[in-house]
């Protein structure tokens, strides 16, 4: 189905719908986002530059009829200069407003704005490595930084005493809470907001010092304030998951005043590319 969906570009062209021109800020169809899950769920999100009910419904109806495998068909009207949709309303045309991913009997709700690794099979391997490196016995307080939809937090929760997850995107945190409830997990807490504003010394004093910190920041790495708070917290172990070796090396250098690297394991999340998670 993936090549066919990508081939839907021809359908758009045949209908004479203009693609969005970023430089001139004109056109109609901006982007087509596809998310798949190991459960068979399939999400498609079409982003338009402006509303045109007749054209929009014709295109969405075509996708719904041509690809009945789609379980979540949604759209966004984004009239901004940039392509980000995190601050835009996502509307459901057909099906659910999410897909379900599954691993080790746990189910994870993933919405259109929620971060989740694109390679489900390798994501499972990555999370197993993170759990192994965390060395949990069931008695630890764990902080999961940049938790996304709470996948790692919920994944390790059965081996921890308590897990606190922090994430910038509010919708992702709502999904994280739903994921805990969905799996009857009661030892997790989640907070939404800028990491440097939430993870403070006061936060540590209020919630307790973490025995283990698992951090999976974006490509930009961690803010200096976040690193300083981690150094203040002095967890026994830090598991650093990164998609950018350069910023990871920078952050590890800053953490080296109190910590040293004991293990490194790369995970090939994007086969046949130069990208790797470590």
Report each predicted region and the residues it spans.
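Short Gly/Ser/Thr- and Asp/Glu-enriched loop/turn motifs at secondary-structure junctions
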Residues: 27-29, 39, 275
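Short, conserved charged micro-motifs
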Residues: 52-58
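Short, aliphatic-rich beta-strand segments
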Residues: 34, 40-49, 107-111
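Single conserved hydrophobic/aromatic residue that forms the stacking wall/gate
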Residues: 1-7, 12
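Active-site phosphate-binding and catalytic loops of NTP-dependent enzymes
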Residues: 16-22
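Rossmann-like S-adenosyl-L-methionine
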Residues: 55, 63-65, 69-278
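Short, solvent-exposed loop/turn elements at beta->coil junctions and helix N-caps
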Residues: 22-23, 29-31, 266-269
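Short, surface-exposed charged micro-motifs
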Residues: 31-33, 100
